[in-house]
């Protein structure tokens, strides 16, 4: 670069100082950019072009200097007297504090002083105001004093209204506007001077600006900062800006008389309210000299209500004017226009320090204001109406001492005033820091903990705010940068001028179509509850409020109350409505406050374009919307207590005043948690925990347990537990684990699906591999060894080496295999040799057969080597239709491969004295198996015989203990259906037959397709009845045994599964068919039976006489069937039997009836002797006799005992009579003999219970029961004699012989 070029660059840079600040920055950046241009000619051309642009920009500065208006200062303002001091302080210091009362002129004159210093030419003089109204009115006033139009030299900018031009030197604006500009202009280069007015209000915006400007000053040494404040602790601002100078401007004031007029002066004056107190104060001031009255009110709605009430008083020559921020410009301007008569101005605290209302001589101060305050208890930013501080009260008082002596009437007592705090808490200390952090993050102002606030908030409160914003999903924390990042939702929340919790509810309500209900509820949560509950009228107030209760939600009680108030307000005058509130125990001012907040909220919602629903919303939708702001206020009820576990393990109970108190639901959310004697949840509602998860995704924690392979899903599944702040909103949910732990899922997929074969798939390699593995596993089960098949780890490694690492489920495998199998279809196929370990012994098929043969039956065998399992060992598979054909004989021999082990186990089960004769047991087992032919005899018969031959020692049957033989050496019987599905299994074949008898019968009936089973038969019309029946079904023959079945009025032919049942049914059925075809012998019996026998039959104690006669007839038929060779199976045989029975039945029945009459007579006599008083020594004997008689003579005993036993029955009764005679003489001997009989009888009962039901009907089995009766005769009536020698030992031997 040449010397000439350097001079050009330097010259241009020097000329930048004459430009406006923003132009200076812009050109400086361009100049430094030009330095990078390498071509000298091109660089020179750019310099020439920039020189022209700099000339134009410099011309703008000259024009601005020329346009600066003539500046004059009103002599009557205190600030004019201090102008020189202020001017010098601003010239010599970067920051100046100007303190003075409202009316001193500092707001309007400071910008003019700055202009006189030459400020506002190269940059704007920014002048902030706390409220839009003040920004506009101050701009108009300064423009008026400078004789210019607003929007020219003096401009202003507020929300939705921008009146700033290129010629503007002083820019009035709200502090919020300046904060918003920081986002685009971090150095505030459009300003050379900034005036922060009304800093004593210490709003959040003001504290933001003061902190930001402190950080900015070192980077902008040219920037002048002027802080104006009422005379309320200006030293604090000075200290904040490194002891900046303070210029005090004393206002010109007159003495003000303070009068205290409390609203309720006496205890019994409870009907007097604030409105009446204002009426009284206005009336009192009307007695004074003429002057305007300023009444401070806490809100817009209260102003309107009071204005309406004052207008109705028709005060003479009095104008009522409201003053608040949301009034139209024309309505606001009326306050500052000249007027005649008296004026009453109703204003919010905007008129306390920000605006000077001209002509005010009197002030009425109710002592309250709506002050935004965050409740850490409720976690909600509220706008309660609360008492103002002493400083604010004095500011209000000062408003009436500007033009003359004034009077301030305070609607509270002097003691109340003196007890109030000296200063109002700055907003930073009484606001929700979540909101502060949200706004700072939105504005990019950095970490709140490091930000230089005038008064820094507590770090714990900062953390509380961060946690709340994270809960609401408004911010995320960047741990590396130690900063917060705004989410898209957080960006929306920052635009809503309400508490973030409530804002979150309203935004969510838009999704659920319940914005109206959300606004009603959130505005109610912003104020103190309008429902009052006076101590002396609790029951009455509760009854009134109960009308609005909702049994599931206290939040909906607000909606119900709102709707009620809306209806009443439409129907009633304002006075009547106020009275209604009083009778309904509703605080009228709080109701109006509620309505006021709702109106403000609705306006903001409208500005944001959020639609408000006109139709009522559903319960679920409303509470999901509310839930988004109360996620840390949910609770789960303890099972055994009326208590809830809340967020972070807090324990709370529903407040007694809640509509949910008596029937608390499982899950609730509450608006606030209040701790008194315990922690109470107030304003509660039932929620479904399922609602929480979708709106708390950023807060939920998921834990997983029991990851496991699921065949049906083809994937690894796990149990998921979802918690929010420690509360299990989902206790146990099955989820796919693939995305959570892919490595583990891949391993489990290979191990379970491929190695273990637990997978539903059609892949050919998989089918072949399972088949090969099953063959090798079968060898292990047969030999009861675990050393043949390679271990699972070997198979896992096989698959692991070949399958892609991306395969973590069946779906992934299918996709991968579809591509891979085209090139290497045998990649995953096993070889049988790789499945068998080296050195494994071969297994003989003869020792471990696959089938068991019994007669013509061929039954499949399976093997299981699972000690402890029900089917451990060998299992015989028996198709259900063959169950009745399978016999138990032979199965005790086991298969050849286990037979030696079985014999050894049996020998070891012998009692030690016997067992010692057969040691060592393995040797004797081998010798036994070498000498016998298996299955020729029952195993124990063969074993006893051979052991006796080898040693001469006899082993009794009771010495063997099958229960000591290991289960795997006992055959398991498994009955299967036609689909080979297990129906039942066990080690007792007879138990299975008994349990499945009904199913076997159904099967037999189902295969009887040639019509063999019939019903409704009255004659033998079916030819020959086969004694057995076979029918082929599938691969085997079904065998059954047909028989006639007695059905009372007819007979049927049915199939039975065994010949024993067939025999019993056939006899009864044949008897019935004979009776159906033979005339009844009753008439003959009546003619031939002697009168004595008739009488005996008629006095039958066992049912009706006709039943007894039928019993005799049946017995007669049985006798004749038996006498003629038993049941017949052909039509011819039945015809011959029919003729013989018809010929002989009458006389046979008469003979039987005579014997029955003798039996009944004996019973009658015995019963007579049993009646009356009983000696206790005879009680047991008599009881035994009654039991014996019950077994001999009963309803149906004639056929039951049979014709052969009728004579014996009479003898047994005669034996009882003999016993009774001896019993009275020697009861002790009777008891001894009775005990012997009981022992035998118990042994018989146990034995009979073990027999199959059908077997119990066989004659040899029945004979044991009669032998016991003969034993009784031998003990108690020996003189009657017995037909054969009898003893208890003979009976036991007979039972043993039958058992085999």
UniProtKB/Swiss-Prot annotation:
Supply the enzyme class, top level: hydrolase
Q: Which GO terms describe its biological process?
A: RNA modification
* Residues annotated as binding ATP: 100-107
Q: Which reaction equation describes what this protein catalyses?
A: ATP + H2O = ADP + phosphate + H(+)
A molecular-function term among this protein's GO annotations: helicase activity
The record's Pfam families line, in alphabetical order, gives:
DEAD, DUF3418, HA2_C, HA2_N, Helicase_C, OB_NTP_bind
Instruction: Please list the residue ranges annotated as the Helicase C-terminal domain.
Output: 274-444
Q: Which Gene3D superfamilies match?
A: 1.20.120.1080, P-loop containing nucleotide triphosphate hydrolases
Q: Which UniProt keywords apply?
A: ATP-binding, Helicase, Hydrolase, Nucleotide-binding
Q: Which family does it belong to?
A: Belongs to the DEAD box helicase family. DEAH subfamily.
Q: Where would I look for the motif DEAH box in this sequence?
A: 197-200
* Cited function: Not yet known.
Question: Which InterPro entries does its entry note?
Answer: AAA+_ATPase (IPR003593), DEAD-box_helicase_OB_fold (IPR011709), DEAD/DEAH_box_helicase_dom (IPR011545), HA2_WH (IPR048333), Helicase-assoc_dom (IPR007502), Helicase_ATP-bd (IPR014001), Helicase_C-like (IPR001650), HrpA_C (IPR024590)
Q: What is this protein called?
A: ATP-dependent RNA helicase HrpA
Q: What is its EC number?
A: 3.6.4.13
Q: Which PROSITE patterns match?
A: HELICASE_ATP_BIND_1, HELICASE_CTER
SMART domains for the chain: AAA, DEXDc, HA2, HELICc
Please state every residue range assigned to the domain named Helicase ATP-binding: 87-250
């Amino acid at each position: 670069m040449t010397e000439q070029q350097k001079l050009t660059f330097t010259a241009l840079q020097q000329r930048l100082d004459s430009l406006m600040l923003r132009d200076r920055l812009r050109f400086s950046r361009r100049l430094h950019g030009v330095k990078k241009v390498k071509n000298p000619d091109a660089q020179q051309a750019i310099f020439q072009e920039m020189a022209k642009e700099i000339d134009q920009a410099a011309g703008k500065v000259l024009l601005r200097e020329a346009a600066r208006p003539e500046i004059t200062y009103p002599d009557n303002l205190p600030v004019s007297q201090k102008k020189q001091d202020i001017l010098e302080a601003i010239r010599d210091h970067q920051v100046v504090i100007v303190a003075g009362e409202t009316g001193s002129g500092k707001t309007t004159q400071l910008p003019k002083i700055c202009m006189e210093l030459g400020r506002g030419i190269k940059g704007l003089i920014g002048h902030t105001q706390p409220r839009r109204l003040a920004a506009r009115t101050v701009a108009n006033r300064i423009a008026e004093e400078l004789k210019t139009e607003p929007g020219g030299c003096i401009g202003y900018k507020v929300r939705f209204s921008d009146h700033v031009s290129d010629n503007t030197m002083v820019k009035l604006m709200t502090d919020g506007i300046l904060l918003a500009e920081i986002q685009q202009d971090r150095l505030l280069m459009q300003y050379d001077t900034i005036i922060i007015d009304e800093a004593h209000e210490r709003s959040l915006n003001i504290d933001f600006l003061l902190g930001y400007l402190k950080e900015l000053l070192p980077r902008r040494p040219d920037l002048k900062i002027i802080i104006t404040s009422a005379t309320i602790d200006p030293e604090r601002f000075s200290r904040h800006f490194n002891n900046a100078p303070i210029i005090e401007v004393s206002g010109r004031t007159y003495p003000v008389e303070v009068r205290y007029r409390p609203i309720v002066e006496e205890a019994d004056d409870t009907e007097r309210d604030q409105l009446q107190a204002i009426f009284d104060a206005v009336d009192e001031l009307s007695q004074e000299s003429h002057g305007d009255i300023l009444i401070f009110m806490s809100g817009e709605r209260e102003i309107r209500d009071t204005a309406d009430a004052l207008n109705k008083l028709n005060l003479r020559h009095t104008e009522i004017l409201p003053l608040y921020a949301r009034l139209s410009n024309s309505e606001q301007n009326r306050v500052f226009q000249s007027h005649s008569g008296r004026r009453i101005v109703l204003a919010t605290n905007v008129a306390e320090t920000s605006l000077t209302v001209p002509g005010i001589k009197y002030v009425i101060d109710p002592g309250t204001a709506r002050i935004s305050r965050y409740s850490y208890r409720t976690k909600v930013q509220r706008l309660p109406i609360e008492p103002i501080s002493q400083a604010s009260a004095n500011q209000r008082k000062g408003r009436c001492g500007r033009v003359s002596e004034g009077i301030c009437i305070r609607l509270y007592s002097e003691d109340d005033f003196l007890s109030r705090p000296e200063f109002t808490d700055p907003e930073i200390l009484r606001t929700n820091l979540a909101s502060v952090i949200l706004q700072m993050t939105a504005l990019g102002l950095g970490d709140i903990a490091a930000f230089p606030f005038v008064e820094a908030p507590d770090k714990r409160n900062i953390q509380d705010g961060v946690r709340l914003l994270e809960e609401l999903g408004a911010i995320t924390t960047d741990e590396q940068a130690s900063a917060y990042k705004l989410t898209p939702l957080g960006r929306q929340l920052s635009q809503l001028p309400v508490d973030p919790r409530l804002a979150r509810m309203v935004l969510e309500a838009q999704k659920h179509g319940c914005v109206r209900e959300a606004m009603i509820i959130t505005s109610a949560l912003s104020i103190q509850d309008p429902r009052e509950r006076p101590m002396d009228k609790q029951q009455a107030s509760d009854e009134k409020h109960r009308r609005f209760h909702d049994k599931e939600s206290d939040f909906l009680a607000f909606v119900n109350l709102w709707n009620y108030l809306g209806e009443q307000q439409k129907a009633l005058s304002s006075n009547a409505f106020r009275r209604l509130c009083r009778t309904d125990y509703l605080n009228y001012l709080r109701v109006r406050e509620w309505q006021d907040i709702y109106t403000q909220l609705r306006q903001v919602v409208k500005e944001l374009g959020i639609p408000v629903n006109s139709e009522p919303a559903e319960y679920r939708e409303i509470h999901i919307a509310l839930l988004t702001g109360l996620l840390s206020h949910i609770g789960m009820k303890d099972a055994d207590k009326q208590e809830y576990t809340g967020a972070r393990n807090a324990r709370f109970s529903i407040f007694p005043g809640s509509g949910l108190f008596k029937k608390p639901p499982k899950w609730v959310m509450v608006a606030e948690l209040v701790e008194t004697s315990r922690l109470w949840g107030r304003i509660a509602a039932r929620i479904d925990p399922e609602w929480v998860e979708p709106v708390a995704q950023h807060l939920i924690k998921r834990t997983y347990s029991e990851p496991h392979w699921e065949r049906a899903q083809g994937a690894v599944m796990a149990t998921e537990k979802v918690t929010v702040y420690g509360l299990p909103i989902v206790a146990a949910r099955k989820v796919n684990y693939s995305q959570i732990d892919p490595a583990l899922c891949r391993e489990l997929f290979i191990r379970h699906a491929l190695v273990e074969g637990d997978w539903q798939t059609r892949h050919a390699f998989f089918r072949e591999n399972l088949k090969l593995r099953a063959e090798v596993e079968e060898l292990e089960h047969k030999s009861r060894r675990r050393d043949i098949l390679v271990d699972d780890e070997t198979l896992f490694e096989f698959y692991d080496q070949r399958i892609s690492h991306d395969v973590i489920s069946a779906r992934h495998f299918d996709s991968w295999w579809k591509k891979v199998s085209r090139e290497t279809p045998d990649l995953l196929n096993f070889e049988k040799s790789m499945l068998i370990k080296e050195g494994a012994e071969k297994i003989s098929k003869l020792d471990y057969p696959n089938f068991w043969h019994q007669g013509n039956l061929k039954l499949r065998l399976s093997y299981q080597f699972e000690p402890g399992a029900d089917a451990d060992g060998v299992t015989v598979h028996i198709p259900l239709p063959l169950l009745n054909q399978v016999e138990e004989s032979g199965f005790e021999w086991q298969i050849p491969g286990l037979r030696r082990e079985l014999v050894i186990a049996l020998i070891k089960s012998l009692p030690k004295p016997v067992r010692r004769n057969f040691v060592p047991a393995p040797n004797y087992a081998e010798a036994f198996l070498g000498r016998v032919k298996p299955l020729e005899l029952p195993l124990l018969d063969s074993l006893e015989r051979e052991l006796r031959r080898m040693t001469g020692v006899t082993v009794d049957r009771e010495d063997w203990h099958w229960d000591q033989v290991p289960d795997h050496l006992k055959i398991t019987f498994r009955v299967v259906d036609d689909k080979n599905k297990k129906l039942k299994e066990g080690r007792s074949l007879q138990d299975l037959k008994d349990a499945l008898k009904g199913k076997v019968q159904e099967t037999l009936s189902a295969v009887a397709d040639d019509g063999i089973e019939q019903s409704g038969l009255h004659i033998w019309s079916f030819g020959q009845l086969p004694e057995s029946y076979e029918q082929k079904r599938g691969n085997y023959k079904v065998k059954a045994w047909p028989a006639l079945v007695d059905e009372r009025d007819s007979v049927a032919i049915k199939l039975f599964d065994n010949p024993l049942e067939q025999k019993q049914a056939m006899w009864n059925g044949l008897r019935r068919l004979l009776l159906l075809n033979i005339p009844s012998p009753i008439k003959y019996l009546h003619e031939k039976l002697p009168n004595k026998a008739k009488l005996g039959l008629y006095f039958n104690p066992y049912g009706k006489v006709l039943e007894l006669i039928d019993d005799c007839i049946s017995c007669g038929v049985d006798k004749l069937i038996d006498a003629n060779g038993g049941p017949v199976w052909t039509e011819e045989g039945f015809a011959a039997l029919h003729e013989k029975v018809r010929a002989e039945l009458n006389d046979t029945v008469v003979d039987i009836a005579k014997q029955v009459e003798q039996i009944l007579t004996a019973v009658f006599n015995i019963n007579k002797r049993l009646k009356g008083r009983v000696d206790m020594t005879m009680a047991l004997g008599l009881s035994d006799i009654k039991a014996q008689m019950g077994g001999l003579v009963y309803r149906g005993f004639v056929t039951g005992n049979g014709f052969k036993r009728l004579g014996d029955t009479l003898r047994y009764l005669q034996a009882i009579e003999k016993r009774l005679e001896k019993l009275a003489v020697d009861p002790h001997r009777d008891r001894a003999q009775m005990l012997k009989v009981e022992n035998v009888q118990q042994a018989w009962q146990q034995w009979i219970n073990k027999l199959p039901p059908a077997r119990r009907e066989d004659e040899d089995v029945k004979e044991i029961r009669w032998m016991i009766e003969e034993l009784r005769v031998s003990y108690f009536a020996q003189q009657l004699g017995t037909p054969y020698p009898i003893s208890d030992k003979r009976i036991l031997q007979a039972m043993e012989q039958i058992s085999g």
